[in-house]
């Protein structure tokens, strides 16, 4: 399993890790985070994911380190703006796009960033996000995704983009 996201509270990472541990597969996870939160803040966010929480507690002891390896897999963290990040091509099977809203953080939702994320995904890879904003969905299509609205948790709907064909540009 391979994922990429904005790390922030580590929720997406922990959910992906719990899933990988339950299925007995290794996780290779790359997260981009412009402003990492302090260890003390991260330690307060507890989730009902017993396997992942055990690993996460160990990771917090070395926080903020940029690379963690374990029997469960690997977590790499890039502490910079996603616009500056160099991402591996055709590497990821999934991307969690989880910055603040398009209004609050328009750069992270821009076409250049979406193109970068599309190029990092393998064909058929998925990009998932809580935003269902029309302008964002149009930019996602332009970046080479088939765009779908899906039922959301706590929201009316979310967006899933499926990487199709060869990435544009």
Which ranges hold each PLM region?
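S-adenosyl-L-methionine
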Residues: 1-4, 41-89, 107-112, 130
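SAM cofactor-binding core of SAM-dependent methyltransferases
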Residues: 1-61
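A short SAM/SAH-binding and catalytic strip from SAM-dependent methyltransferases
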Residues: 93-108
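Conserved beta-strand signature within the Rossmann-like core of class I S-adenosyl-L-methionine
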Residues: 96, 123-131
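A short glycine-rich, Lys/Arg-flanked "PGG" loop and its adjoining helix->strand segment in the class I
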Residues: 107-124
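Class I S-adenosyl-L-methionine
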Residues: 132-169
